[in-house]
C-alpha cells in the first residue's frame, strides 16, 4: 500500500506544468499517490494535465475548486483529503531531480524520530536556466534541530519536503482559520514557516525536522519587481508570537487578533524591514536588466533601511549557512 501522497496545487501554470509533471514521471521512486488540486485555473493548465496523463498513464486524482482559494487553502485541503501517513507538496512550476522523492522518503522512513525531511533548492528562471543561488535552509542533524527548537526559534525550511501528515495535523497543519477575508490573503504567506514551526513544538517528544544537504529541486524564481515583503514579515512576526505563546502555555492569537494588537510604532518598524527587502530585490532586478542607476539607487535604499540585510541574504542564499 502506498504511504505517500504527492500534491501539486495548480493555478494558471500552463507555461510550466508539463515540465513539472515530466519531472514527477522521471522519479526513481513511483510508489506514491499523485493528487492535483486545481485552484480554479482559468488558463489551459488542466487541459495540459489531462493530455499529459493520456499520453503518460499513471495514477493521479484531480480535484477542482469552483473558485480561487489561494495556496494556503489548497494545501489545507490536500493535507486533509490525503489518506497516507506521509505528505509532500510540489509547486506547479518547480522541477524535481530524478532521485528527489526516493532520497527524502528513504531518509524519513529510516528513522521514526524524523517528522519531516527537506532538501536544498537551486534557483532557475522562467526559461528553466540556472540563475545562481538557491534556498539552503534547515538543520542537517537532529541535534541541531532540537537545540534550535529548545531556543524557541522559527524554523525555516523550503516547502519541497516529505513530512508526517498525521503529526502535522496534530498541531494544526496548514491553518486557514482566523484570517481576514479578502486580499491580501495572509494565510498564503510563509505558510510553510508556520507549519514547520508548529511541528517543531514536538521536539519535546523526541521528534525532529532535518534536511538532506543536497540540491534535489529546481525552484522557479520570479524576476519582476518586489512589493509583498510586508505581508511576509508580518506573517513571520505572527508565527513567532504564537510560538512563544504556545511554549508559555498561552492560547494562540488569530491573525486578526495579532494584527489588531500591533502599535503604530511596531507597524512602522515592519514597514522598514519590508522596504529593505523590496529594495534589495528590486535593485537586483534592475542590475540584471542593465539599469545601473536604478539598481544602485535601490541598493542604497536597502542599506538605508536595514544596513545588515544584504549580508544576511548573501549568507542564506549562497549556501554559506550550510
Model regions: which residues?
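A conserved acidic beta->alpha catalytic loop
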Residues: 38-47, 67, 91
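Short, well-formed alpha-helical segments that are part of the catalytic scaffolds
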Residues: 13-26
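Conserved nucleotide-sugar donor-binding catalytic segment
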Residues: 144-232, 237
Amino acid at each position: 500500500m502506498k504511504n505517500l501522497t504527492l500534491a501539486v496545487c495548480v493555478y494558471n501554470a500552463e507555461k510550466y506544468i508539463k515540465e513539472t509533471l515530466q519531472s514527477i514521471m522521471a522519479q526513481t521512486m513511483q510508489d506514491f499517490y499523485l493528487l492535483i488540486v486545481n485552484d480554479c485555473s482559468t488558463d489551459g493548465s488542466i487541459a495540459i494535465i489531462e493530455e499529459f496523463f493520456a499520453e503518460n498513464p499513471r495514477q493521479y486524482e484531480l480535484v477542482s475548486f469552483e473558485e480561487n482559494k489561494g495556496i494556503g487553502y489548497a494545501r489545507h485541503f490536500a493535507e486533509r483529503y490525503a489518506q497516507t501517513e506521509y505528505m509532500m507538496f510540489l509547486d506547479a512550476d518547480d522541477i524535481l531531480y530524478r532521485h528527489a522523492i526516493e532520497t527524502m522518503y528513504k531518509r524519513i522512513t529510516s528513522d521514526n524520530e524524523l517528522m519531516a525531511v527537506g532538501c536544498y533548492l537551486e534557483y532557475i528562471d522562467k526559461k528553466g536556466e540556472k540563475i545562481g543561488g538557491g534556498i539552503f535552509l534547515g538543520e542537517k542533524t537532529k541535534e541541531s534541530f532540537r537545540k534550535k527548537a529548545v531556543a524557541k526559534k522559527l524554523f525555516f525550511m523550503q516547502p519541497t519536503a516529505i513530512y508526517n501528515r498525521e503529526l502535522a495535523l496534530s498541531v494544526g497543519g496548514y491553518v486557514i482559520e482566523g484570517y481576514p477575508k479578502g486580499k491580501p490573503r495572509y494565510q498564503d504567506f510563509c505558510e510553510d514557516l508556520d507549519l514547520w514551526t508548529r511541528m517543531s513544538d514536538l521536539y519535546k517528544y523526541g521528534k525532529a525536522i532535518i534536511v538532506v544537504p543536497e540540491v534535489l529541486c529546481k525552484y522557479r524564481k520570479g524576476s519582476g519587481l518586489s512589493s509583498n515583503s510586508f505581508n511576509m514579515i508580518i506573517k513571520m512576526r505572527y508565527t513567532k508570537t504564537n510560538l512563544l505563546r504556545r511554549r508559555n502555555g498561552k492560547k494562540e492569537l488569530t491573525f486578526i487578533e495579532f494584527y489588531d494588537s500591533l502599535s503604530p510604532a511596531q507597524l512602522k518598524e515592519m514597514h522598514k524591514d519590508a522596504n529593505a527587502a523590496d529594495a534589495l530585490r528590486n535593485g537586483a532586478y534592475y542590475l540584471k536588466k542593465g539599469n545601473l542607476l536604478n539598481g544602485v539607487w535601490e541598493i542604497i535604499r536597502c542599506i538605508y533601511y536595514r544596513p545588515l540585510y544584504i549580508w544576511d541574504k548573501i549568507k542564506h542564499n549562497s549556501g554559506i549557512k550550510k
